Amino acid sequence: VSYKILNAADYGVPQRRKRIFLIGSRGGINVSFPNPSHSEKGIDSKKWVSVFEAISDLPEPTEDGVVSLENNVFSKYQKWIRDSKNKTSQHITPRISNLEKEIIPKIPPGGNYKNIPDRLSTIRIKKLKELGRRTTLYGRLLPDRPSYTLTTFFNRIVIGCNIHYKQNRTLTLREGMRLQSFPDSFNVISSTKQGYYVQIGNAVPP
């Protein structure tokens, strides 16, 4: 049995997602892990795929989640992820509270709970400020970097860095799928609302 910790960003996924991979083989059979194709600086390889390169071509979300994709392709990743389709679905904005609607505009790209004014800070936020830990919470994505690891709650701002880098909202299901490298032709089926996000957050980038 061989094992290694791999970062999805090193293989062209627009997400810094470290996971341990195990390969089991019969005796006498040599196995090896693939060499990284991308890197942070991109000196001897391709540069990490950024959030902007992954989702910037998507129009604003709609009520039914179906959107037309215009010819505004900004990257090779977008051309590939579209899978030759001119529309996609499940591009719906998750609901957020009135307090969160006030909080989100206060957080700049790369910012987090530390940018939230005291007048909007809940007891939890005040405690986070006091401890100074878990700096991805209430985070807004940077457009020129891969996202942080998507979790099963990437539809919430209180758990992780899930705020769109430009628009004042959380990530849509489709944006989450793109950051996991699922093509636009792929759709998620679930019997519960949260189940959609659980499936994508738990997935291994294909």
Q: Model-predicted segments: where are they?
A:
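Class I S-adenosyl-L-methionine
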Residues: 1-127
